[in-house]
Amino acid sequence: MSEAAIAKKAEIVKQTTDMLNAAQSAIVVDYRGLTVAEVTDLRKQLRDAGIQMSVIKNKILDRAVEGTDYEDLRSTFVGPTAVAFSDEDPIAPAKILKKFADDHDALEIKGGFIEKSVKTLDEINEYANMPGREELLSMLASALQDPMRKIARAVKAIADKEDEAA
């Protein structure tokens, strides 16, 4: 192999390592059996959520995780491999990919990491079933508003009772 080709591959490995290190989460999938239209639809869904999906050679991924906390992912680098990276919402890739995999049997989630910690397939599925950040904030706001509503109703009831008595 020429020196230029080796340098190019080393740069690709470095870029992949940088993407892994910068990501809040990365989910490894096998996309074998998906049609071009299905892959395009999946990429669009991921892109709309701010997630980048890249098809990366297994050997490059293997070298990119070498010496990192993600070495346990090496066993997932078999067959056609794509990786969905998220820099913002660590749960979003798991949610979108699980939903897509439920609708398309050909997509298989193989593993990944969430918030810098390698997760098993079962753990990724648990995360995927959790409410998203926006849903959790909405639930929190509702929980905080409920006691205030009760107090407001009680104060209003007392005021109405005093108005009737007067």
From Swiss-Prot:
User: Would you say which domain of life the source belongs to?
Assistant: Bacteria
PROSITE patterns reported in the protein's UniProt record: RIBOSOMAL_L10
Q: Which UniProt keywords apply?
A: Ribonucleoprotein, Ribosomal protein, RNA-binding, rRNA-binding
Q: Which CDD domains match?
A: Ribosomal_L10
Molecular function GO labels: large ribosomal subunit rRNA binding; structural constituent of ribosome
Subunit note: Part of the ribosomal stalk of the 50S ribosomal subunit. The N-terminus interacts with L11 and the large rRNA to form the base of the stalk. The C-terminus forms an elongated spine to which L12 dimers bind in a sequential fashion forming a multimeric L10(L12)X complex.
What is the designated name of this protein? Large ribosomal subunit protein uL10
